[in-house]
Amino acid sequence: DVCPLVPIANISMEETAKYAHQLGKRVGEELGISGYFYENAATSNERKNLATVRSGEYEGLKEKLSKANWKPDFGPTQYNEQIVSSGVTAISARDFLIAYNVNLNSTSTRRANAIAFDIRENGRAKLVEGKKVLDKDGNPERIPGKLKAVKGIGWFIEEYGIAQISYNLTNITITSMHEAFYETDVAATKRGLRVTGSELVGLVPLQAMLDAADFYLKKQERSLGISENEKIKIAIKSLGLDDLKPFNPQERIIEYVMNADAEKKLIDFSVKDFAEETASESMAPGGGSIAAYVGTLGVSLGAMVANLSAHKSGWDSKWEYFSNWAEKGQ
């Protein structure tokens, strides 16, 4: 199995890789389990790609471990009873991976796969008259798909009675969630299908949701200077994340989950609670907090004017100018 360490906040990838190495050392010494480091924790370029590390699978471990270039990074280096029992593991430091499914108005796995092949980086095998075209080394040639850092396959989901395209977005700084959704919609339309929504498996970074909202707001030529809560609502509706079941941001956005048990801050108070706390016997909030709040209200009024202006009839050509000022207000 794999154990990736993913930096979320206040830590670099380099620091995360060091923790991955420490974890691997402990797994090897304390549990007696062998394994490899991959991606940003890899000890060689050959081991960066997880698919390469996994090649041969469990059945090929005995042969793999006999090769000098596949000596494990941690744990026993020889094939033994422990490896027979537990196999090996892979530990890494990597960027956030999003497991993301796009819903279709179809039950056809074949059509879903065709769209997946259009989009995923690995694309599809090159065919001539139904036969695979081979390169000079005898390997099948491939026609690359539209998006980088995307793995995908089509399948039928019995639970919902629809076909989906199941994606792994392996680097959302290269291909974002909304790009995958948008390009899938384009490819589906070309094939006579329609995208009805999408589904997240697991958690998603807040920034991915905000970026999705900004993408669709720009397409609508609407102001980007709106609140975080409003952007989350727009992202949910634009991507159809509530198509199959309710989408609760507090349970699905990783930053919200991490902060759920955090102590309540002044910024989280309602106006009434803030006023009552100010009037209490405690020394804080005091004059500084009150001045900051009054200043914030002034900025809010400015942002309101910018947002209203961005959507004003006859000022369509200036929406981006006003949107920029509204964003500064936020």
Q: Model-flagged regions — what are they?
A:
Residues 311-330:
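A structural-propensity feature for long, helix-poor, extended segments
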Residues 8, 283, 306-314:
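Short, flexible helix-adjacent loops and helix caps
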Residues 2-273, 280-281:
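Long, contiguous binding/interaction regions
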Residues 188, 219, 309-310, 315-316:
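Short, intrinsically disordered/low-complexity patches at protein termini
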Residues 4, 279-305:
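Conserved phosphate/anionic-ligand binding catalytic regions in large, soluble enzymes, centered on
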Residues 121, 190, 299, 303, ...:
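Short, well-ordered loop/turn and helix-capping segments at boundaries between secondary-structure elements
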